[in-house]
Amino acid sequence: MLGTHFPPPPLGPSEGRAAPCTFQIPDGSYRCLALEAEESSSEDGLQGEVRLVDLEEEGTSKSRVNHGTPPLSRAPAIIQPSSCCREARGGFQHSDKPSREWDVVQARKVMTASVSSSPVPRVAQKPALGRSTSFTEKDLKEAKERSQRIAAQLTTPPSSNSRGVQLFNRRRQRVNEFTLESRGQRSPKLSQEALQTGHPSSPIGHAPGLSVNPTSPSKPGSPKHSSSQSPSRGVPGHIMEGYSEEASLLRHLEKVASEEEEVPLVVYLKENAALLTANGLHLSQNRETQQSSPNPPETEEVPSPAADINQNPSSPNATLTTAASNSHHNQPTADVNQNPPATITPVQQNSSETQCSPNGTLDSKPNTPSADDGQRPVPAEEVRSSILLIDKVSAPPSAASPFSREATPLSSSGPPAADLMSSSLLIGMQPSTLVASAEQEVSGHAAVTTPTKVYSEVHLTLAKPASVVNRTARPFGMQSPGTTSQIEQSPMMGRRHFGEKAWAPPASSMADRSPQPQRHIMARSPMVERRLVGQRSPVVERRPLGNFTPPPTYAETLSTAPVASQVRSPPSYSTLYPSSDPKPPHLKGQVVPANKTGILEESMARRGSRKSMFTFVEKPKVTPNPDLLDLVQTADEKRRQRDQGEVGMEDEPFALGAEASNFQQEPIARDRSGPAAAEETVPEWASCLKSPRIQAKPKPKPNQNLSEASGKGAELYARRQSRMEKYVIESSGHAELARCPSPTMSLPSSWKYTTNAPGGFRVASLSPARTPPASLYHGYLPENGVLRPEPTKQQPHQMRPSLYALSPVKEPAKISSRATSSRASSRTVSPRAASPAKPSSLDLVPNLPRAGLPPSPALPRPSRSSPGLYNAPVQDSLQPTAVSPTYSSDISPVSPSRAWSPRAKQAPRPSFSTRNAGIEAQVWKPSFCFK
């Protein structure tokens, strides 16, 4: 076999990647475990041979691992030729020795698969290619030597942990060494295995011939199943016979190593968990190997159920592995290859049918697992070895039945379907990959196109160790259905086969859930395969009976119309989830890649339906916009001023300058009201100013806020006010005084009110009214005087800007609350009469204070505003004093206005405590009513 397999080392470059020799070393020890289990069953000679064969098979399985084909399938091919082929030749009625050989081979295979699976990522290293070359050049003797070396190395490491590490490194090296060789060996062994274990599943049965065809490129020496199988059988027989002596020594060494390494195996698996996970198939195979090789007797016991179960799916494989191995090792080229090439639809339909006949155990073996079990207690182990393959294959047989049903669409691609099947064998797990590809075809790939794809990609898989690369790429790409999906699917399917032993019951439920599991739809075959693998336990019987049929139904998606529609829809849907239809194969063979891509895509899809990450309702701001309040209040003031009549205000803004022009209307009302009647004008004044501004805002801030109220804004106000004073105020002394304190004092609510105040400044009558308040607030007079002119100049602009929105709002609110009393007092009382009525005097005062000075007296003014009110009306009569009265009047009115908290409340402006006190608001109310 090695000689036969060595010719294809040209494929070895890619195959070499797949075949890890390093893994073979632990595999030997693992085989020792299997051999130990079989030694108990007195299979030492055969096991030695099998072990030697397994070493070869390790290379083959490693190359298969690189191909993405489960190494397990190859090992059975090698071992089956000796035992299973003998069983096939001798019928299912071989003694337990062949079956135990199968167990040994299976355990070894599984371990080999797991060992080789771990280093698959490392296969690329290929450090000791010279060894692999020498190995290919050298005979089985060198393989014996290597087996001995491996056994010695396995036993040599002092500590289990260090052994695990050393074994891992050695396996890496050996994998790299045997990469080329393993690939050369892989195809014939794979084809043998496919013929033996693979043929039971007609996809594998088909695959062997085609597998040999793709294998023939890799290995022209083994172009056909029978040719490669018979040489392989002969070689394994010779190998096992020739090495039986050394194999016993190796067995003892491997026993020691395996005993020593049974823990290291676990440690190794743990250490190599990442690699095993990366090669999920091998990880699951390792688990199976650990399960089957530690439990080969259990597996034998389970094979009765597992033979039932696995032989339901797998015993067709097993029976086909034996009988079909006989018929398909002998027939495979004619039966499998002929059927698929001749008519993939008939053969695949005959896959379900022929495989129902050879696999007749397949369809009939769910019904006749017992017969197969009776016949296949030996194949049961073959079923184990073929469980990986046959479970994988049996899912394809189920897939093969659907695949044959699919074969109807695939029939047009008859040879390509055979290629798919061959790629299934090539990939080793690709019966399920074929099922995946068949389901891909079912999903939406053109039946012909997908098989052709699969065939080409299968060749690529064989030619390339790209299976590993495809594995890496496939989870992401997943678009290339044939190559990567099959390759990845086969390992992934192996994962599912092995990992989904628990899946077996879910598999049937999955069959029921088939429409729901979109990925599982395509994963049905893998799930069936998983179930088969998992159902080596009696659970598997349920699955072949229930789930085994549903997977064909899933695979039958093409054949069975309703199932086809269901399966087609979900595969198409799952195809939508993956980049392309290959995803359903990924669902089968590439569970992890499919999950990866599917998770991302599903998460994306879910995200679409989900609320955006930042879906939070922003609570609307309840606070009124100062600008809006100012606008509203200003409009109200303007309307009131207009009602009062805009007189003399036009001249004032020009004197004040462009700044004052903004507030012309308010000053006009104030001016007009001032000259007409200081008392009434001031109340009207206040009403205009207060109703819009004070009412809108509650009393927020005192004069202190006004004084504190601005940085640059206050400075700008002060400067503007000083300028305004220069133009508007005749008395420079007051202007200067106002200029100094005004920046802070004028900034508060008085500023906006200063908008109205400019009229007071502009009109002498207003200024006299302001003058008495100034006298009242002597402490604030300079500040108020300073603030007044500044408000007159600066407030007009910035009072209406939202800078001082609080004061306008405050004034309107206060105006409304105090309007009635203020109106009555201001109306009925003359400026002096209003002096006893603080509201009226405040009205007179606020007119001017708004104009300029409310800020300075703001806080103190509320208390002083009452006397200021009395003084304010008196000075209202003194209105003739224009400049200084204006400032003083501004001061006093501002103080009342500040006593009215509304202006102070009007945000930055509420500088006047008099307004905060609410004095002005009261006065304004009368003035408003006076309107």
Curated annotation (Swiss-Prot):
Region named Disordered: 56-78, 113-243, 280-420, 542-591, 691-711, 775-918
Gene name as annotated: Synpo
GO BP annotations, alphabetical order: positive regulation of actin filament bundle assembly; postsynaptic modulation of chemical synaptic transmission; regulation of long-term neuronal synaptic plasticity; regulation of postsynaptic cytosolic calcium ion concentration; spine apparatus assembly; visual learning
Protein name per Swiss-Prot or TrEMBL: Synaptopodin
Signal peptide annotation: none
Family as reported in the entry's similarity comment: Belongs to the synaptopodin family.
Residue numbers carrying Omega-N-methylarginine: 850
Alphabetical UniProt keywords: Actin-binding, Cell junction, Cell projection, Cytoplasm, Cytoskeleton, Glycoprotein, Methylation, Phosphoprotein, Synapse, Tight junction
Modification note: O-glycosylated.
Organism: Rattus norvegicus (Rat)
GO MF term list: actin binding
Location of the protein in the cell: Cytoplasm, Cytoskeleton; Cell junction, Tight junction; Perikaryon; Cell projection, Dendritic spine
Extent of Basic and acidic residues compositional bias: 136-148, 373-384
Known tissue expression: Expressed at high levels in brain and at moderate, but still significant levels in the heart, skeletal muscle, lung and kidney. In brain, expressed in the cerebral cortex, hippocampus, olfactory bulb and striatum.
Biased composition (Low complexity): 214-232, 569-580, 816-841
Entry's induction text: Depends on the long term potentiation (LTP) and the activation of NMDA receptor signaling.
